Amino acid sequence: MLFDQIARNKRKTWLLLLVFFLLLGLVGYGVGYLWLGSGFGGLILALVIGFIYAVTMIFQSTNVVMAMNGAREVDEQTAPNLYHVVEDMAMVAQIPMPRVFIVDDPSMNAFATGSSPKNAAVAATTGLLAVMNREELEGVIGHEVSHIRNYDIRISTIAVALASAITMLAVMARNMMFWGGGRRRNDDDRNGSSGLEIILLIISLIAIILAPLAATLVQLAISRQREFLADASSVELTRNPQGMINALLKLDNSAPMQHHVDDASAALFINDPKKESGLQKFFYTHPPISERVERLKQM
């Protein structure tokens, strides 16, 4: 079961790469067509940027994501309780000891990152460490270690990298649109406009507007099931479903994180760091806590 899941996650990695690079190419084509005079040139440029960004994130994901979230690295002397729990869970999961980080934030949350178990890291907020008891902390850390063991982190890291690149290009395009930075067309261009050019213009605008949303939806599609799997895998490691249930119930009552969390990296956290309401709740990267608890009760 576990090895089948790891194999599926590896296949999903390549599928995600294909989908995200397709979205990236559409945005690049739109930017190139509208502002550079060459849709194909913009497409190539966007793919090159996205590839470099993705490779950088994959091989430096730990440092990049930790820096994005203001995390500081700790050791056995500076944070013994957290360090020992991470050490215990890693030992049970039979993975190398991850690096350990703390985020100075009063909310309760945690996340893991790294492209493979060999270069992974786990982070917890000061709020989580202040509220959770040992059994609950083991449940939370077991959840994050399970993400590492199941290679979920690689999928999330690629999603974070490419979604960020797509959003960056789309925002740049919208800013150029707002400030009137589009390519100038001469009289011959205007007189020679064809139906094809109009279609390309419409496609370019739609790509720029909708690609970030599409990237978010792809992240949603892969994020929710991996949360259920990590909850169950945590119980497999701790042999204590009630500890995980109690931890989730406390997380459900946590306030939003005070420091800014990048939209692309929000999916890495065990609990939604923004606690958004209204229409935004339909774009949660996490399944409802109540549903996660019910699934654990059925184990």
Curated annotation (Swiss-Prot):
InterPro entries for this protein: HtpX_protease, Pept_M48_protease_HtpX, Peptidase_M48
Cofactor: Zn(2+)
Binding site for Zn(2+): 143, 147, 227
BP GO annotations: proteolysis
Recorded topology in the membrane: Multi-pass membrane protein
Keyword Metal-binding among UniProt keywords: yes
Cofactor note: Binds 1 zinc ion per subunit.
Localization in the cell: Cell membrane
Annotated family: Belongs to the peptidase M48B family.
Organism field: Streptococcus thermophilus (strain ATCC BAA-491 / LMD-9)
Gene: htpX
UniProt name for this protein: Protease HtpX homolog
One Pfam family from the record: Peptidase_M48
A GO cellular component entry from the record: plasma membrane
Active site: 144
GO MF annotations, alphabetized: metalloendopeptidase activity; zinc ion binding
Assigned keywords, A-Z: Cell membrane, Hydrolase, Membrane, Metal-binding, Metalloprotease, Protease, Transmembrane, Transmembrane helix, Zinc
Transmembrane helix among keywords: yes
EC number: 3.4.24.-
Residues passing through the membrane, by range: 14-34, 39-59, 153-173, 198-218
